From Swiss-Prot:
Residues 52-82 are annotated as: Disordered. InterPro entries: G_neg_Bact_CarbUptk_Porin, LamB-type_porin_N_dom, Porin_LamB, Porin_LamB_sf. It is a multi-pass membrane protein. Keywords: Cell outer membrane, Ion transport, Membrane, Porin, Signal, Transmembrane, Transmembrane beta strand, Transport. Pfam families: LamB, Sugarporin_N. GO terms for cellular component: cell outer membrane; pore complex. Residues 1-25 form the signal peptide. Its main location: membrane. The lineage of its organism: Bacteria, Pseudomonadati, Pseudomonadota, Gammaproteobacteria, Enterobacterales. Part of a cryptic operon that is poorly expressed in vivo. May be an ancestral sugar porin with a broad carbohydrate specificity; it binds aromatic beta-D-glucosides such as arbutin and salicin, but with low affinity compared to the binding of maltooligosaccharides to the LamB porin. It is found in: Cell outer membrane. Belongs to the porin LamB (TC 1.B.3) family. This is Cryptic outer membrane porin BglH.
């Protein structure tokens, strides 16, 4: 473009000379003609230099005056360090057309970040996700995870879990908005190089559509600010992140719900969802589908004092059984369905220097109580790996949890996850009906903060659980884990900042295994593993 401008300019400047030369050709001598040509050439060169300088100014960023400094060797330091593809601080956008009576520029400045957000909001599409992946090896062959839900995740997980969410705004006018949301989740195997979905040897490669729903705002006169949704979606999950299970979880095949409905000082989440289960017979070989429905109600974000909020929650699951399904339970050895519930409360305290702690109290009965008694994954499911079975007799279980992180000075941070549980007369998936249990699990993760991007620390985990069956026989399960790690981060928070890359060395030992009989490779009761793992969400 610049060369073309130069050539055009030269032609325009030489054109008058050509006309004048033709008109004077008959009266000028050769010397006079040469003199005129030299003069015109000098003028052309001057004009070309002017255009060249103007072009340079267009592409040279403005700089501020500064003194020239020297480095330790006495050389002048470059006051204008080079950078590639530097982003402008702002962009100009055209405002709405002004009336004749209005004054001022029709353009205004907008930061590049705001402009990017404007474009994203205008398109109405977002892509969010999460995944983890990594490499590890162990002292006795292939590394194995054990009791992640009690001993902690660092250096103890070898899966490639992912969540991918697509959201598209389809309407946004007159105070009403409609969005379509689809979420996929699953696992990509970390053992073999091929990871075809459906080639599920070892249970590693699988995927599902966990969410597919429409969410709206502004359609309910009594709750215009709330999110009203219909489709395959459940109530929001609340996770004990260091243990990789949920204190609040309501899975759904389909449902209808309302979130963030402002009522009084807090907000209400309410969901009515369907979650059918496979009801098994006592041989665990035959099954029948039972339609169940769940009501999940939460009153959240209730202010208590400075930076403290309270949530109160309740959940009830009931079955809508056909006559043939009831007959199978009465006469053909299928387990009876028993309605199940969970109630509780949680308190979240944020700290002035960053960090938080969340305390929760939960009580449940029947099949949800059975899942309170699991030492590995302890989310409040109504089934065990999707199967409903067991003689549930109305027994109850209680769970107290603490999780959070706190900064100690400028260079230390510690995260925690502590759970105490007990239950009476529950169905245990390890020790059967009319079981009692008591368990405690504790994981702490202190680290030294080198800077915003580096931390070095240790994750220490210990748990012990005792079950007592209907005959008062006792079964114990316990173990501990020590993980040394260094992480590359983008912020100092352990629980709320990602991406994160970890390098770790882990020693894990099973002290007692009377509930599951677990062993590592070569029938060992311990394992030393090293590896690296990446975890990211966006």
């Amino acid at each position: 473009m610049f060369r073309r401008n130069l050539i055009t300019s030269a032609i325009l400047l030489m054109a008058p000379l050509a006309f004048s030369a033709q008109s004077l050709a008959e009266s000028l001598t050769v010397e006079q003609r040469l003199e005129l040509l030299e003069k015109a050439l000098r003028e052309t060169q001057s004009e070309l230099k002017k255009y060249k300088d103007e072009e340079k100014k267009k592409y040279t960023p403005a700089t501020v005056n500064r003194s020239v400094s020297t480095n330790d060797q006495g050389y002048a330091a470059n006051p204008f360090p080079t950078s590639s593809a530097a982003k402008p601080d702002a962009v100009l956008v055209k405002n709405e057309e002004k009336n004749a009576s209005e004054t001022g520029s029709i353009y205004s400045s907008m930061t590049l970040k705001d402009f990017s957000k404007f474009v994203k909001d205008e398109i109405g599409f977002s892509y969010n996700g999460y995944y983890r992946s990594g490499w590890g090896t162990a002292s006795h062959g292939s590394p194995k995870s054990w009791a992640i839900g009690s001993l902690g995740r660092f250096g103890n997980e070898y899966s490639g879990w992912f969540d991918l969410q697509l959201k598209q705004r389809v309407y946004n006018e007159n105070g009403k908005r409609v969005d379509a949301v689809v979420m996929m989740d699953g696992n990509v195997g970390q053992q073999y190089s091929t990871g075809w979905f459906g080639d599920n040897a070892g249970g590693e490669n699988y995927m599902q559509f966990s969410d597919m729903y429409v969410t709206t705002k502004g359609f309910l006169p009594f709750a215009p600010e709330a999110d009203f949704w219909v489709g395959k979606h459940g109530a929001p999950k609340i996770e004990i992140q260091m243990l990789d299970w949920k204190t609040q979880r309501t899975d759904a095949a389909a449902g209808v719900g309302l979130e963030n409905w402002k009522v009084g000082p807090g907000k209400i989440d309410i969901a009515l969802v369907r979650e059918d289960v496979d009801d098994y017979d006592r041989s665990l070989q035959n099954k029948q589908q039972i339609n169940t429905n769940t009501i999940d109600l939460r009153y959240k974000d209730i202010p208590l004092w400075d930076k403290a909020t309270l949530m109160v929650s309740g959940r009830y699951v009931t079955a809508n059984e056909s006559a043939s399904e009831k007959d199978n339970q009465d006469n053909n050895g299928y387990y009876d369905w028993k309605d199940t519930w969970m109630f509780g409360t949680s308190l979240t305290q944020k700290f002035d220097k960053g960090g938080f702690n969340e305390f929760s109290f939960l009580v449940a009965n029947n099949s949800i109580a059975s899942n309170f008694g699991r030492y590995a994954g302890a989310s409040p499911f109504t089934t065990f790996n999707g199967r409903y079975y067991g003689d549930h007799t109305g027994g109850t279980a209680v769970r107290l949890t603490s999780q959070g992180e706190a900064y100690i000075g400028d260079h230390f941070i510690v995260a925690n996850a502590i759970v105490y549980s007990f239950g009476n007369d529950i169905y245990s998936y390890e020790t059967g009906a009319h079981s009692d249990f008591e368990s405690i699990r504790a994981v702490v993760r202190p680290a030294y903060i080198w800077d915003q991007y580096n931390q070095t620390g240790v994750e220490l985990g210990y748990f012990t659980q005792q079950n007592k069956d209907a005959n008062s026989n006792k079964f114990n399960e316990s173990g501990y884990k020590t993980t040394l790690f260094h992480t590359f981060k983008v912020n100092t928070s352990m629980l709320t900042s990602r991406p994160e890359i970890r390098f770790y060395a882990t020693y894990i030992k099973a002290l007692e295994n009377e509930l599951d009989g677990f062993t590592f490779e070569d029938n060992k009761d311990d394992q030393f593993a090293v590896g690296a793992q990446a975890e990211i969400w966006w």
